[in-house]
A protein has these predicted regions:
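Active-site neighborhoods of divalent-metal-dependent phosphate/nucleic-acid chemistry enzymes
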Residues: 81-127
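Helix-adjacent hinge/juxtasegments
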Residues: 53-81
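Structured helix-beta-strand junction loops
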Residues: 35-36, 79, 135
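Acidic, PIN/NYN-like endoribonuclease modules and their adjacent C-terminal/linker elements
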Residues: 3, 110-148
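Short beta-strand segments at enzyme active-site cores
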Residues: 40-43, 126
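Alpha-helix/helix-capping structural signal
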Residues: 9-10, 44, 88, 130
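Short, well-structured N-terminal submotif of metal-dependent ribonuclease cores
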Residues: 1-41, 58-68, 147
Length: 148
């Protein structure tokens, strides 16, 4: 059994039936769950989900209301295991940020990796593998590699 953290883009596509990636993501998540893999989410990916879901469609968002987004977030919390925010996350994040000299927007993805390390999660499922740095203990997985 493998443990996967679902990246924000995976969650967004899983709830956006109009997305060209919807079927790929749906198939991948169903495959993982039916093969006894565990799928996790964290507060950060839910916060990022909210940002994109409530942003207007004209600026690359989903254009949802707060109420629609709240329902979607509750569904995600009910469907996947929500990882606890622990004090170790900041320490791990700071160590990764300084060791790898990460700056700018990549810091957000680095924090996801810190959460994964703090909880001994082995894999991150994402549509954007290049957003993540290479960390020996973490395998970054694109849905195509699971569904091929």
């Amino acid at each position: 059994m493998t443990h996967y953290l679902l990246d924000t883009n995976i969650l967004l596509r899983s709830r956006d039936i109009g997305s060209p990636d919807y079927n790929l993501i749906d198939r991948t998540i169903r495959y993982l769950i039916s093969n006894n893999h565990r799928c996790f989410i964290t507060a950060q990916v839910l916060i990022e989900f909210w940002v994109v879901a409530t942003r207007p469609a004209a600026v690359n968002g989903l254009g949802w209301t707060s109420e629609e987004t709240e329902r979607a977030v509750q569904m995600l919390i009910n469907q996947f295991e929500l990882l606890e925010e622990t004090p170790d996350i900041f320490r791990i994040w700071l160590s990764l940020a300084t060791t790898h000299k990460i700056s700018g927007k990549r810091i957000h993805d680095l924090r996801i990796q810190a959460v994964v390390l703090a909880h001994n999660i082995s894999h991150i499922l994402t549509l954007n593998p290049k957003d993540f740095i290479q960390v020996e203990e973490i395998t970054i997985v694109h849905p195509h590699s699971i569904n091929s």
